[in-house]
Regions:
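Bacterial Sec-dependent N-terminal signal peptides
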Residues: 1-25
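N-terminal accessory beta-strand-rich subdomains and adjacent acidic, glycine-rich linkers
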Residues: 25-143
Length: 144
């Protein structure tokens, strides 16, 4: 009984230490590669990547630092896309197709992955961005 109370107390402490952290997870089709996306304090987008329960990429921040150009951005808010984000939505989907290359050693190529699409809003600049994570059995890719 004491163990259960300690576990509940530890869980409550961890929840208080990480307010509003909503992590989204997507696995590769075979389940070995696991990508986790989260917004850390200050609305900074981050991700981690594990392979067979071992970290491959530790927590890494995402974002774009924009060039300051007074002529190209007349009167625009030049806030970088590094922090201050809120997650507005997310969805997970699966893609699986086989295609035939024009030439090469392989007759067919399978393109099979699970995708996490995260929609973010930066209220200070009124910008919206979408980050897509494609998780394959042998790795991952991302794009803005």
């Amino acid at each position: 009984m004491k163990r259960i109370k300690n576990s509940i107390a530890l869980g409550a402490i961890l929840l208080m230490l990480s307010p509003n952290v909503k992590a989204q997870t997507v696995k590769s089709p075979d389940g070995n590669v696991v990508l986790t996306f989260a917004l850390k304090e200050g609305g900074v987008p981050t991700y981690t990547l594990d392979y067979k329960h071992k970290p491959v990429i530790k927590q890494s921040e995402l974002g774009l630092e924009l060039k300051r150009d007074k002529h190209a951005s007349k009167g625009m808010n030049e806030t970088d896309l590094l922090a201050g984000f809120n997650e507005t939505s997310h969805k997970v989907s699966t893609f699986d197709e086989t295609w035939k290359p024009v030439w090469g050693e392989t007759a067919t190529i399978r393109n099979h992955y699970n995708e996490l699409e995260v929609d973010l809003n930066q209220p200070s600049s009124k910008r919206n961005i979408v980050i897509r994570f494609l998780v394959y059995n042998d790795g991952m890719g991302l794009r803005y």
